[in-house]
Amino acid sequence: MYPWNDSRNYSTKKLDSIRKINTHFIVGVIGKMCLFEVPITILCLLISVYYGESALPFGVGTLAFLTIGVICQLLGKNRTDIRIGRREGMLSVTITWLVLSLLGAIPFLLKTGIAGNFFSALFETISGYTTTGATAYADIESLGKGLMLWRALLQWQGGIGIVVFTVALIPIFSGGASHIFNAETTGITHDRFLPKISDVAKRLTQVYILETALFALLLWLGPMGLFDSICHACTSISTGGYSNYTSGVSYFNSPYTEYVLTIAMYTGSLNMTLIYFAILGKPLKLIMDEEFRWFTGFIVLTTLVTAIWLWHIGAYSTIEETFRKSVFQCVSLGSSTGLLTADITAWQPFFWFIALLLMFINGCTGSTAGGLKMARFIVLVKNLANEFKKQIRPHMLTPVLINGKQLSISIVHQILAFCVLYVFLIISGAILITLDGNNFDSSVSIAVSCVSNSGPGIGKYVSNVAEAGDFTKAVLSFLMLAGRLEVFTVISILTPYFWRR
């Protein structure tokens, strides 16, 4: 009898081929991160009570995080298997984001007066954690101060996600920190400027907090109140894009506010490690970085083209306003923040192509930005240039260099595979969204927006996805999560190969 005809033999071999996952580690990670959310939900609860809002949403939310956190901590405490590999890193990051999103949706579900459902609440929470910034609610002001702060803090945590993970987990699971770091950090390599990941995480956390405090202060010096300043500082430095108002930043009608937020979004899209060195008095490390120079040049170029176009179509009456709207929107889209000061659908189709290009690339590696990242774009351009050279001189050795260092063939191939998967995910998502009755323009733009964690789409989803069906919101939620975790992390888990020895 052939083995593939013996169901018992096949089942046994299949069972043996399944790798035993260190579930204690994963459960422990979930518990630790749930407990990390408790003081944050308590803060939102206090804000709700202070402004005379119902305490129920965050009261239940706090209890849910606390209960799940304690249970998972107890289940993950007595671990006998200390083996921690890449699979555990990928699973812990993905499952933790899912659990946090489900529990984080509770305050939205329990908020009285909100016309919504489970998928709207889940979409809003995932959009927050992934720093996408697309919202499922058409009337933001009706959410109340407590949920406004919750939305801002969701994005602030999501922006510094890996740092939050490592700082929280190092005391208990130091052995698995590097795998979590690799599972969630963005970029083509994972270089560290300190030998211990715990030290890296702490330094980057300090930089992140300093940046947030600085921009909150600068915003407060303008027309914003203290509450709005804190919220918008959190959502801009994290390149998240949530605003406390349905009309977005245009609510404040303040050029000063727009310029400050432009700088904040641009800062958030830069490599945090290089910013750390700049703070230490080594700005040349930032200035001489090839990715930084490409990204800055890209933003300058798109800003100039956009400004010329807006002036050509007569969108604004003064040069200053034309420049301000152009630089704000290009930085916002190019950093994957997604804050809006204007209806970009009124800027005509030519700008829509610029917007899609900005959303597609997005920010630098090691930043809070989503998207493809400029470093990968550089590799694509240089690899394409090398292929043209080989057409003329087939035997010519043409390595791909970044900052003067040669990238290995394996890394170049990995980047090419990532880009193919990235585009495939966008196309697949757009096709699924059209099945729910959405038109082509809206489907493609919102798919690009969610995979790149950029926020606004083009067409009917430029400001919110409140009118989207449950199926569309579910698809978009998956796209946001996959995009935030660098595509490979989530997609790999869905393959049979991931579970084999």
Where are the language model's segments positioned?
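Membrane-proximal intracellular helices of multi-pass ion channels
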Residues: 1-501
